[in-house]
């Protein structure tokens, strides 16, 4: 007697969903491509459905990275990652950054066993379930996103600040917050990237900040050679710059 466990069923569903999504992309050659932001303050929700010319599945992008499906149009191409259970992790994001591979991720993780080709095809054209992983057009923007730290916020009469700011100075009340260049609020700091008040992601409001890497020109980062980073803290980083120099930072624990 053949007994199939729940784990086997889940794996089978995952495999079928993943394969169906790739086949639909290969057949239709269409996918929604998000707008490529130029800066952290570029909040446009625009994007568009693009029709490509050909597709290639499971293509090796490097010795360690394989794309789910690549779409081609002339000399341009787009790598598509299908998320069923696992999203593109930090290690792969860095690989894609270093290789300069334009990549999007299609999120199918909420779709269970009752899916149809029509449901998947619709999802592939919907902005709400597709995120931009990397675009070489705005490399500086993505370098900041990879190297930024999520920091908890605190509020006082001077505004909203991160706790334990890496650029902090002690004020008269011995409260740590950034006063870089005379600016005394995170929103006005050069190291501020973005604000997140989504309690489904974090328990409290957070800032994405790169103050720990103050002085590095993000626009000249060629490759991220090493990054030791936990959820909210960078411990060490090694960067190859455009002029061939290497910048290393060991950040205190």
Where are these regions (language model features)?
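Non-catalytic C-terminal interaction segments of nucleic acid-processing enzymes
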Residues: 102-104, 109-253
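A short, charged
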Residues: 25-32, 112-117
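Short amphipathic alpha-helical segments with coiled-coil-like heptad repeat character
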Residues: 7-13, 88-90, 197
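N-terminal cysteine/histidine-rich coordination modules
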Residues: 1-27
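Functionally engaged cysteine thiol sites
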Residues: 9, 13, 41, 189
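Active-site metal-binding core of divalent-cation-utilizing nuclease and nuclease-like domains
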Residues: 33-83
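Basic, amphipathic alpha-helical patches used to engage nucleic acids or provide basic targeting signals
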Residues: 77-119
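Short, flexible, glycine/charge-rich loop motifs used to bind or transfer phosphoryl groups or to couple energy/partner
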Residues: 68-69, 94, 179
């Amino acid at each position: 007697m053949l007994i199939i466990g729940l784990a086997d069923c889940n794996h089978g569903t995952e495999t079928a969903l993943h394969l169906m999504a790739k086949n639909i992309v290969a057949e239709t050659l269409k996918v929604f491509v998000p707008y490529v932001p130029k800066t952290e303050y570029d909040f446009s929700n625009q994007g568009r459905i693009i029709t490509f010319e050909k597709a290639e599945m499971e293509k090796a992008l490097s010795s360690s990275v394989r794309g789910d499906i690549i779409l081609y149009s002339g000399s341009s191409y787009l790598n598509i990652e299908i998320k069923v259970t696992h999203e593109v992790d930090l290690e792969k994001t860095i690989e894609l950054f270093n290789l300069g591979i334009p990549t999007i991720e299609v999120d199918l993780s909420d779709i269970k066993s009752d899916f149809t080709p029509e449901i998947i095809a619709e999802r592939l054209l919907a902005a709400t379930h597709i995120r931009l992983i990397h675009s070489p057009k705005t490399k500086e923007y993505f370098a900041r996103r990879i190297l930024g730290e999520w920091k908890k916020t605190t509020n006082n009469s001077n505004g909203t600040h991160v706790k334990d700011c890496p650029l902090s100075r002690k004020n008269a009340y011995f409260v740590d917050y950034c006063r870089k260049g005379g600016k005394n609020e995170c929103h006005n700091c050069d190291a501020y990237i973005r604000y997140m008040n989504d309690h489904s992601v974090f328990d409290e409001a957070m800032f994405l900040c790169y103050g720990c890497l103050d002085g590095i020109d993000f626009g000249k980062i060629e490759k991220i050679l090493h990054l030791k980073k936990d959820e909210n803290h960078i411990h060490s980083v090694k960067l190859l710059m455009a002029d061939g120099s290497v910048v290393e930072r060991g950040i205190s624990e």
